[in-house]
C-alpha cells in the first residue's frame, strides 16, 4: 500500500521531474496511471487513447484541444479547481502553460489496445493528417515523449503530403492564447 502524496510538498521537492516536451511524472502506474503534469509543455500532437482520461487542474488553467467527430477542432478550457472526463477515442492535445499543474488519471491499457499520436496540418482545411504514430502503451512516461521527439527530428514525417508545409514540432511561443492571462494584466497564476 503506497503512502498518501502531499501534492504541494511533492511539487516543491520534485518540480525538476516535470520536463518538456510532455512535463509529466507518473506517481502511480499499477491499477491506474496517475500523473502529475506541469507547464509549459511543448507538443503539437493529438493523443488518441482507447480508454477515458480524467483531467484535474490543481493550479492555473489548461487548454485541451480536441477533435470532435462532426464538429471539428474545439478548445476545452479546464480552469483551476475544475475537472473534465475525456471520453475514449477523442483526439486531444493538452496545452499546459507556465506555472500550472494538473493531475491526469488513465486506466491501464487493455491487451491489444493501440495508442496513437496524430499530427494535423494547420495550413490545410478539414483536418489533414501529417503523421500518425501507433503503439501499445506500456509506459506512458517514456513512450509518448519518444514518439514526440521522433516526429520533431524527422522532416519527412513533419511534411504535409497535401500542401508540402512542414508541420511544427512545438507550438510557436505565444501562438496559443493563455487562459491564465488577461490582456494587459500580469500572469494570474502564481508560482508556489
Question: What residue spans do the PLM features occupy?
Answer:
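Jelly-roll (double-stranded beta-helix
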Residues: 1-57, 61-83, 91-192
